[in-house]
Amino acid sequence: MKRNILAVLIPALLAAGAANAAEIYNKDGNKLDLYGKVKAMRYLSDADSNASNNADKSYTRIGFKGQTLINDQLTGYGQWEYNFSLSNSESSSDAQSGNKTRLGFAGLKLKDYGSVDYGRNYGVIYDVEAFTDMMPEFGATGYTRTDTYMLTRGNSMLTWRNSDFFGLVDGLKIALQYQGKNEGSGTRATNVSNGDGYGASLSYKIVEGLTINGAMSSSNRLNANSASSTTSQKMAAYGSGGRAEAWATGLKYDANGVYLAGTYAETRNTNPFSGASYTFAGNSTATAVSGYANKVQNTELVAQYQFDSGLRPSLAYVQTKAKDIENGIGDADLSKFVDVAATYYFNKNMSAFVDYKVNLLSDSNKLHLNTDDIVAVGLVYQF
């Protein structure tokens, strides 16, 4: 009986991102839930040059969700979530590294008309990415990146969401989003800044277990005060242009213990290069390449099965390719890997996992990007 219950509960936990939250208060239409998790994790790799791929990656997250019933039609709500790194020293300069607010927003929900909230939240492009962000550790590591326009979590998100299309169409969900300007400054880097933008997503449950969705976004890019090619998004030496755009579509099947999903996305002038360099003709050493990809194509596939015993094996493929990079570089993979993983759920609160990222980038890849295979091993307690 316990195993059958696990088979039902675990997919729900994966979709919700947390186990059953602890109810702190529930009285007179006011409710407050506390949730969190501790992830004790280690990366293992034979990396010689990138120590971060062979290191402690443990962290804890804690958050709350609250709501208040204003009247029989209107409900107020809010959510906050914070991440604490567990791999830092207590007193050195790294003590606060990795500690950050992940989510923080408040809003109103008007029955069949949907909800409106504002704050630090997920961008609508992540509505699609969530279909394949299912691996124990290495999910959402292709083209999505925090504080990069509306790809995933970011600041100044004004979001309207509606389920079942005003109560008229079961399974049809829509979202409209506006992101306010977050300009680079002395403390905020250019590659995590954005101009104002808008986006939308649409999701439809075709039949029980089968869902299709799509999303798009378009944002203004910024000029830094110095308006130079190294600090301006619009004038970047690589990936210049006035707007950052993205679209994505996905399909998933989630029923009877089987989870299958695929997503495809394209971006324009959105994704910054990270750790890239290129050996130009006539040079014997590589030169750093800094800027943005003119175009990115991203493909992700995930297959998982939930056994009654609590075991959940996973197989995934991710490829992120930059197109038409300037100065003769052309097309180049930014990420390409197969992910082989397994999670064992002892119960709804405790699990263990191993996640093996098989890096498919060749040692001779154009942008000299990291080619290490990585194994993540960990224990997770969540509530």
From Swiss-Prot:
Parts of the chain on the Periplasmic side: 22-30, 71-74, 110-112, 165-171, 207-209, 253-258, 308-310, 347-351
Record family assignment: Belongs to the Gram-negative porin family.
Source taxon at top rank: Bacteria
Subcellular location: Cell outer membrane
Assembly and oligomerization: Homotrimer.
UniProt KW Ion transport keyword: yes
Main location: membrane
Signal peptide (UniProt feature, chain positions): 1-21
Annotated GO biological process: monoatomic ion transmembrane transport
Sequence ranges on the Extracellular membrane side: 46-58, 87-100, 123-155, 179-198, 220-243, 269-296, 320-335, 362-372
Name of the molecule in the record: Outer membrane protein Omp-EA
One example GO MF annotation: porin activity
Pfam family, one: Porin_1
InterPro entries reported for this sequence: Gram-neg_bact_OMP, Gram_neg_porin_domain, Porin_dom_sf, Porin_gammaproteobac, Porin_Gram-ve
PANTHER family: OUTER MEMBRANE PORIN N-RELATED, PROTEIN YDDL-RELATED
Membrane topology label: Multi-pass membrane protein
Ranges annotated as spanning the membrane: 31-45, 59-70, 75-86, 101-109, 113-122, 156-164, 172-178, 199-206, 210-219, 244-252, 259-268, 297-307, 311-319, 336-346, 352-361, 373-383
Function: May play an important role in maintaining pathogenicity in plants.
Keywords: Cell outer membrane, Ion transport, Membrane, Porin, Signal, Transmembrane, Transmembrane beta strand, Transport
One annotated Gene Ontology cellular component of this protein: pore complex
